Curated annotation (Swiss-Prot):
The chain crosses the membrane at residues 10-30, 47-67, 104-124, 140-160, 172-192, 214-234, 250-270, 283-303, 347-367, 369-389, 396-416, 422-442. It comes from Albidiferax ferrireducens (strain ATCC BAA-621 / DSM 15236 / T118) (Rhodoferax ferrireducens). Transport of potassium into the cell. Likely operates as a K(+):H(+) symporter. This is Probable potassium transport system protein Kup 2. It catalyses: K(+)(in) + H(+)(in) = K(+)(out) + H(+)(out). Keywords: Cell inner membrane, Cell membrane, Ion transport, Membrane, Potassium, Potassium transport, Symport, Transmembrane, Transmembrane helix, Transport. GO terms for cellular component: plasma membrane. GO terms for molecular function: potassium ion transmembrane transporter activity; symporter activity. Belongs to the HAK/KUP transporter (TC 2.A.72) family. It is a multi-pass membrane protein. It is found in: Cell inner membrane. Its main location: membrane. Pfam families: K_trans, K_trans_C.
Amino acid sequence: MSRTSNRESLAALTLGAMGVVYGDIGTSPLYTMKEVFSPATGVPLDGVHLIGAVSVIFWGLMMVVTLKYVLLILRADNRGEGGIMALTALAANAAGKTARRRTVLLLMGVFGAALFYGDSVITPAISVLSAVEGLEVVTPAFKSYVLPISVTVLIGLFAVQRFGTSLVGKLFGPVIMLWFAVLSVTGVAEIIQQPAILAALNPLNAFEFLRSQGWHMFVAVGAIVLAFTGVEALYADMGHFGKRPIQLAWLGLVLPALAINYMGQGALLMRDPSALANPFYRLFPQAWLMPAVVLATLATVIASQAVISGAYSMTKQAVLLGLLPRMQVQYTSAKEIGQIYMPEVNWLLLISVLLAVVGFGSSSALASAYGIAVTMTMLITTALTFFVVRDGWGYPLPVALAATAVFLALDTLLVVSCSLKFFQGGWFPLVLGLVIFTVMATWRRGRELLIDNIRHDDPELLPFITALSADVVHRVPRTAVYTVANPDTVPQALMHNLKHNQVLHERNVILTVVFHDVPWIAFDERVQVKPLVPGFWKVQVNYGFKNAPDIPRALELCQSQGLSINLFETSYFLSREIVVPTKGAGMAHWREALFAIMSRNAGSVADFFRLPNNCVIELGTRVQI
């Protein structure tokens, strides 16, 4: 590829990263400064404290985003992929020398993933509300319309998800680029009028601000953390855009624009303290307010879209890793496999977001709910990164501590500060995360118990089919594919077929699908074929947690290993377990009941593995756990 085309590709990816990766953190100026100096924090609104607060925001962006994420954590990729799931797999594989340590690391990662859903609810709610609240600055008469308009925008956003984002997605980058340009221009205009705010670039002013607050510092930091929300997207979307475009976008445009706008708002408040009612929109001349509201609403919708898409991707990964039951996945783009739509996730998210909007009623009230889930995820990310640096990259313990200790201390400060807002709304995303964590843990444990029971009750495969080949059993043409969780025991569907139909197919494939804790499995590693006895083969299909399962396509790959399967003459036999909860088993009875409900409502195996419906025979089996 030529140097020119390389530059063009890098520019396109950098522009795309602006639209998807930086939408959330890029819309934080809408509400952060207003919350830092709200009556709830008790921070005086004067020049010294304005310079100090802006200094904390600026150096927080430098420490949390630039040093921690852009320079350190983006290096911890799992075969090019990022995100809490990929990092968890990386840390668990590197540091999981004992089963106990591996389990602890996996639980940390799963809890961090569960907390992400709390962020997925709060981000669209607070972003859209804060943008539409700009109408109140245009005229107070619009105040009563803010909530209905916000609800309408959110319903519209979730309603169009099933059509995909391939068309409007091309506009995300340019719109967000315009947004950051506007942030810069409006900020510079105020800085010129009040250049004293540039003292915020001195880190000593940040330390002095925190020192002067005493124990009250935690309350102030709990509001300042709003400037860092959305930072996890830098790492989560690394697989889509690559490390370099994300770094270039941050250092080249996003960081300067955010720093300039926060200093601009600080300069405005130094000059006119009455602007605290909505310092972001007061940066604009009256004639530009309506266009500013429209642009802000577009930017927040884009930020929300990125979080919603992230929720789909996270859920799909959790399903493939065995943390959630199967769900319907619709691919909305013929070109981009990462563009998916999950109806159940979409509507559950919409209901949760609307409850948050109506329940809290304003962006200021929602600001209290924002932060706990985000900062706890940041803390978990740093802790997992320590194990990657120490055990994955092989650095000595002092080096690993030097690379992560400061960030661990900083993240702990942010978590403690946000915890003070627990009773003001911080409980909402935390409870949501705990519920999802419980669901994930219950599903994982339930599947383990289910497979153990099946393994205990069913006969071993090889002796069974060896004896079967010696019997005179009526054989019918075609190939039968039996999907099983445990490849060493006889499939329930095979025993049902023999018992009720008293026939055996000429060719029988015992198929096991294994999902590995790596993002991708290449085609040359996708299938493993093992002949058993005449007429029987064992096939293992391997997928990563970002692959799209497609069994018919995988079976075509068996030909390279000596097994030719005519897909037009193949029947797929599936066993559907009907779970019966019993007291005194491996889980609390309420968890067994929850698992039974999830198992009963899990998505179709045929749809999940893309099996042709007219070639599928599904047989039910009652299993006690």
